[in-house]
Every structure is written in structure tokens, then in C-alpha cells.
From Swiss-Prot:
This is Large ribosomal subunit protein bL32. Residues 1-40 are annotated as: Disordered. SUPFAM superfamilies: Zn-binding ribosomal proteins. It comes from the Bacteria. Residues 1-16 have a biased composition (Basic residues). GO terms for cellular component: large ribosomal subunit. GO terms for biological process: translation. The gene is rpmF. Belongs to the bacterial ribosomal protein bL32 family. It comes from Sinorhizobium medicae (strain WSM419). NCBIfam families: rpmF_bact. Signal peptide: none annotated. The keyword Transmembrane helix does not apply. InterPro entries: Ribosomal_bL32 (IPR002677), Ribosomal_bL32_bact (IPR044957), Ribosomal_zn-bd (IPR011332).
């Protein structure tokens, strides 16, 4: 059975655990509409992505 040669220091343990935290999703302000949206994603309200019309926007009832 594999046994560690040295005790893992609290610093090394913390560095390893730093990747386990849940990170909040990032949002950017859309240049055209001013709404918040995810980067590299289509704006669902306008249907635009990188200056091009990709989707037809849904009609609000």
C-alpha cells in the first residue's frame, strides 16, 4: 500500500483544495442592449452573437 513519505503541510493542502471551490459565473454587459449576458454566448433577447443575427428573438407576450 502506498504511504506518503512526508506529512502534507497546511499550505499544500490548501493549494490543492483551492480548485474545489464553486465559482460564480461571470457576466458581461452587452454592447448593444446593455443587458448582462455570459461571455461567448448568444444574447437570447436579441439573438445576436458577435455582431451577427444568429437566432430570431422570441416575441414577448
Amino acid at each position: 500500500m502506498a504511504v506518503p513519505k512526508r506529512k502534507t503541510s497546511p499550505s499544500k493542502r490548501g493549494m490543492r483544495r483551492s480548485a474545489d471551490a464553486l465559482k460564480a459565473p461571470t457576466y458581461i454587459e452587452d454592447k448593444n442592449s446593455g443587458e448582462l449576458r455570459r461571455p461567448h454566448h448568444i444574447d437570447l433577447k436579441t439573438g445576436m452573437y458577435r455582431g451577427r443575427q444568429v437566432l430570431t428573438p422570441k416575441e414577448s407576450a
